[in-house]
Amino acid sequence: MQGFKIARHFELPTAPSQFFAGSSLNRLSFLRSNREFLNKAFYDHTTRFLPFCDLNPALLVKDDKLVTLSYPQISKYFTFSPFEHTDKQIAERFSKGESLPVLVYMGNEERNGPTDNWSQHNVFAIDITGIDELQQSIRDNGGTFVNLRSIFTEQYQLSASDSGACAFARSILDWISRYRFCPGCGKRNIPTMGGTKLVCSDVLLNDDSNCPSKKGINNYQYPRTDPCVIMVILSHDMQHILLGRALRHPKGLYACLAGFLEPGESLEEAVVRETYEESGVDVEKVLYYASQPWPFPQSLMLACFGIARKNAKIQRDKDLELEDVRFFSREEVLRSLEWDAKDGPAPILFPPKLSIARNLIQAFAYDDWTNSQVKM
């Protein structure tokens, strides 16, 4: 990236708040190992439990609100409190055939503002997959289990706080379901720390266990987040935008280029590499814009703007993941963004309004991604 000088300091505006990133809960991560606190929260009459079935949250469709349950509504499914026992005691009971619904401590609502008293108004997620009776009760009371992708596409009007809570809960529940058994030795894992850590039952039950997880911190013992870059690449004169069309996209839909970061790679390097591999376009400047949690299953979208080198040309002879890649003018993008649906399909279709991809495209179209200009 040599030969590039910034004439003036970039003043990136505050990016709009992203869907899935608006939870108002105080996660209280420092209390996740406090069994006494979690046990009191579990039984407290003000605690809310958010039910999930097959990773889908329960929604009161008429109100666009999440279904919440109280302890009396779930108590019959808990033969014992998961927080009144040590991890070893729970492993012993599970080894004898007992089981419990998976719980994830999500945080405190802090309804009256920041506080040091978190004894009330706590929130858990509860996985009720397989508990048909409770699922039916929720449906009988106006609830329905909704695929989170449907919520994302604006079919429902979920609040920012609820969307953030759903993203957190779904990601953790998905992680727990994928790692029911220890990758190190194959024995059953036991959720602990409010559902945010997994401990191998063999380690808990056998002092002479040879499980690799006993020998240090492993990436399967804690939830992971996979970083992805998603970028709007601008032409050198910053008047055109590079978008691609994936084979799986509906006809006419163009979106930002994107891809996972690889080990030993910086954010900027990933933007340059992914753009080159998918389009052949060389990028000489990368600017971070915003991020969006993406709970499918546990990704974090890192949105960036990139500036293409002068006279950069599209060459699609490397990664053929995309069906088409092209530069669009600001006028073309604006025309499609402001298209009246009554006139039929827009010339260019874009990702849903709640996506960070759409926010990036709009930031370019309305020229509000920077308050100054760059000279090459």
UniProtKB/Swiss-Prot annotation:
Any single GO BP term: NADP catabolic process
Enzyme class: hydrolase
Gene3D superfamilies for this protein: 3.90.79.20, Nucleoside Triphosphate Pyrophosphohydrolase
Cofactor annotation comment: Binds 3 Mg(2+) ions per subunit.
Catalytic activity: a 5'-end NAD(+)-phospho-ribonucleoside in mRNA + H2O = a 5'-end phospho-adenosine-phospho-ribonucleoside in mRNA + beta-nicotinamide D-ribonucleotide + 2 H(+); NAD(+) + H2O = beta-nicotinamide D-ribonucleotide + AMP + 2 H(+); NADH + H2O = reduced beta-nicotinamide D-ribonucleotide + AMP + 2 H(+)
SUPFAM superfamilies reported for this sequence: Nudix
Keyword hit for Nucleus: no
GO annotation, cellular component aspect: cytosol; nucleus; peroxisome
Entry EC number(s): 3.6.1.-, 3.6.1.22
Function of the protein: mRNA decapping enzyme that specifically removes the nicotinamide adenine dinucleotide (NAD) cap from a subset of mRNAs by hydrolyzing the diphosphate linkage to produce nicotinamide mononucleotide (NMN) and 5' monophosphate mRNA. The NAD-cap is present at the 5'-end of some RNAs; in contrast to the canonical N7 methylguanosine (m7G) cap, the NAD cap promotes mRNA decay. Mediates the hydrolysis of some nucleoside diphosphate derivatives.
Protein name, UniProt field: NAD-capped RNA hydrolase
